[in-house]
């Protein structure tokens, strides 16, 4: 079993722990090449988790036979590497120089004070794809017939001597059945041995062997035992009793196998969910990039994209958290509105003055229609001409109208 299957809580008191950036193995062009992990040093083992409450480590390294040094080839500041000349190098980076020095001291102490690992011990484990997946297949009903399948025969020819010894032990045990009085004792021993083998199937799974492989061992062993029994035993009653015994044991063994096969289904489902989360995170990065370009009013090529009326309306309604900036923005918006109104008034006046067929009647009609504009014009002239009273501003004389018309 992988040593990564240990939660951050189960590690207990650590020699050193903290947040570090780890360089990805295959960094894409748009995504970030460094990812933040919670790194824990425990003895000669270095674990990194996605968060402090993670139930399983994202990676594990046994620091024996590794070297720790600063990574001057990396562009990122405060980076260091854990290197092995024959395996691979792991790159980490700290937030500041002080944290990097602490990690270098702790890791250097862990490397120098540990013995080299044995061949059977796991050196490092990093990603979900590196874990051996358990093959889950529905086993065929064993002992349905005395003849074995071609796949089983091929496996039997290439099996190890230990597997052959187990099959011979089963055949020798069956050959001892010669009398009805001895049949019950040998049957009970056979039940115990068969149940022990079935119950030990999870151990083979932990060692890295698939369940179907262990089940083929049992089927082949008993098929060879039944084939060896036919020429040696001449007693028909004992042979029939043995078949009944095996058929009764089949039901219990199949039930036990079903119980053991339910666990890998959950593991396979969790792996599929993890892969889907990785794909969704990659898609989210592209989505974030597109949204950031859209907020900056930029095209995918980096060109300035013209704002639409809807975006302008949203920007007018949107408020800023800073009150001073909000006041300035409001003043700019009001000035823009005033400018539009003045431009409209100027267009109305130009339309009147540019008319070559302008008469007194047309002027009166225009004056009635644009009363507010006339009042605004006289109000602007009032500070420049102090002799004009407010009544004259509100009620202009006929002479003024004539002068304006001329």
UniProtKB/Swiss-Prot annotation:
It is found in: Cytoplasm; Cell membrane. It comes from the Eukaryota. Pfam families: PH. The keyword Transferase does not apply. Residues 144-153 have a biased composition (Low complexity). Residues 272-285 have a biased composition (Basic and acidic residues). Residues 120-173, 253-285, 383-406 are annotated as: Disordered. Residues 13-112 form the PH domain. Keywords: Cell membrane, Cytoplasm, Membrane, Phosphoprotein. Residues 392-406 have a biased composition (Polar residues). CDD domains: PH_CNK_mammalian-like (cd01260). Residues 123-134 have a biased composition (Acidic residues). InterPro entries: CNKSR, PH-like_dom_sf, PH_domain. One of its GO terms (cellular component) is cytoplasm. PANTHER family: CNK3_IPCEF1 FUSION PROTEIN-RELATED, CONNECTOR ENCHANCER OF KINASE SUPPRESSOR OF RAS. Interacts with guanine-nucleotide exchange factors PSCD1, PSCD2, PSCD3 and PSCD4. Enhances the promotion of guanine-nucleotide exchange by PSCD2 on ARF6 in a concentration-dependent manner. This is Interactor protein for cytohesin exchange factors 1.
């Amino acid at each position: 079993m992988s040593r990564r299957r240990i939660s951050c809580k189960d590690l207990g008191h650590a020699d050193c722990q903290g947040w570090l950036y780890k360089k990805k193995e295959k960094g894409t062009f748009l995504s970030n090449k460094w990812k933040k992990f919670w790194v824990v040093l425990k003895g000669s083992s270095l674990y990194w988790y996605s968060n402090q409450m993670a139930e399983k480590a994202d990676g594990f390294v046994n620091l024996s036979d590794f070297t720790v040094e600063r990574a001057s080839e990396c562009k990122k500041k405060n980076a260091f590497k854990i290197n092995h000349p024959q395996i691979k190098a792991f790159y980490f980076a700290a937030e500041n120089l002080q944290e990097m020095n602490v990690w270098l001291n702790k890791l250097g102490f862990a490397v120098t004070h540990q013995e080299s690992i044995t061949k059977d011990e796991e050196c490092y484990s990093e990603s979900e794809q590196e874990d051996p997946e358990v093959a889950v297949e529905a086993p065929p009903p064993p002992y349905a017939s005395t003849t074995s399948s071609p796949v089983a025969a091929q496996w039997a020819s290439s099996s190890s001597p230990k597997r052959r010894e187990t099959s011979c032990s089963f055949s020798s045990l069956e050959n001892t059945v010669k009398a009805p009085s001895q049949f019950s004792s040998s049957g009970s021993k056979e039940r115990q041995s068969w149940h022990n083998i079935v119950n030990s199937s999870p151990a083979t799974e932990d060692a890295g062997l698939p369940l179907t492989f262990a089940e083929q061992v049992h089927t082949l062993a008993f098929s060879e035992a039944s084939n060896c029994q036919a020429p040696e035993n001449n007693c028909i009653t004992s042979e029939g009793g043995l078949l009944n015994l095996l058929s009764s044991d089949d039901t219990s063994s199949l039930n036990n196998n079903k119980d053991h096969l339910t666990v890998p289904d959950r593991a396979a489902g969790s792996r599929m969910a993890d892969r889907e989360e990785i794909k969704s995170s990659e898609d989210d990065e592209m989505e974030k990039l597109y949204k950031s370009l859209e907020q900056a009013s930029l095209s995918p090529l980096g060109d300035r994209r013209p704002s639409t009326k809807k975006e302008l309306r949203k920007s007018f309604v949107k408020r800023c958290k800073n009150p001073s900036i909000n006041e300035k923005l409001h003043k700019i918006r009001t000035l823009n509105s005033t400018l539009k109104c003045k431009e409209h008034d100027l267009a109305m006046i130009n339309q009147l003055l540019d008319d070559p067929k302008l008469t007194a009647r047309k002027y009166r009609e225009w004056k009635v229609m644009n009363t507010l504009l006339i009042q605004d014009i006289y109000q602007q002239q009032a500070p420049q001409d102090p002799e004009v009273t407010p009544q004259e501003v509100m009620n202009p004389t006929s002479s003024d109208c004539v002068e304006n018309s001329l």
